[in-house]
Amino acid sequence: MFNKMRLKSALVEYKKRFIQTQWPDEKYKWEAVKCFQVNWDVNADDFAAMLTKALSQTGNLLASVNNFPAKMIIKFAEIAQEEVRAMFIELFDEGKDVYERVDSFKQKSNSLLERYGNGAAQHYQYENAICTYLWLRYPDKYYIYKLTEIKAVSNELESDYTFKKGAYADNIRNFFAFYNEICDELKQDEELKNMLASQITGTCYPDPELNAHILEAAKRNHITVKPVKVHSSDVFY
């Protein structure tokens, strides 16, 4: 549960600047999803080359200062192709619990680092990166996970979900439940859906149902919920 009036207030501000400000900055996320969808082939003979193409437009979603998850998982795929292929097959297996899949991917990355890291201190395959892989594969179901932003959104909307550092399983499960609730509200906003439809181009992941807008079109194009400071309050995009 959360304060729906606070969400509506945030959306009023968001819609005022979506086309001129938000979309130009965030369009690349829709393009990253389409790039992944077009190039992903779990059975590719050269899995590392395929993965490189699939992740080629993710930009800062999978690379930032001192954080290089895309580069590292591609390196592992070059060295241990079948192990990494199996990791993604398991991660994308919707018949299994999502947290168990995320945790398994992380633990297997630890093993890869120990054996093939060549002295590297990090594998960078943590909840943020792993949920991003899930989002790229299933953009109508998953979201990008950033704990500090999730906590900010939860506080701003006065939700009854709790997020605590180190509580990995509860955080992941509460995160998806919370954002799904927000999506349910956004899908009722026709103005949001129309705004998104007016901006989608051929380079973007298509959104045939136009179910929502801000949360990555609430399960379609994916733009995920993320706080932006506007008049000292968090708005979502």
What residues fall within each predicted segment?
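Contiguous, well-ordered alpha-helical segments that form the cores/surfaces of helical PPI scaffolds
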Residues: I130-R137
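An N-terminal alpha-helical hairpin/helix-loop-helix interaction module that forms a charged
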Residues: M1-H123, P139-Y237
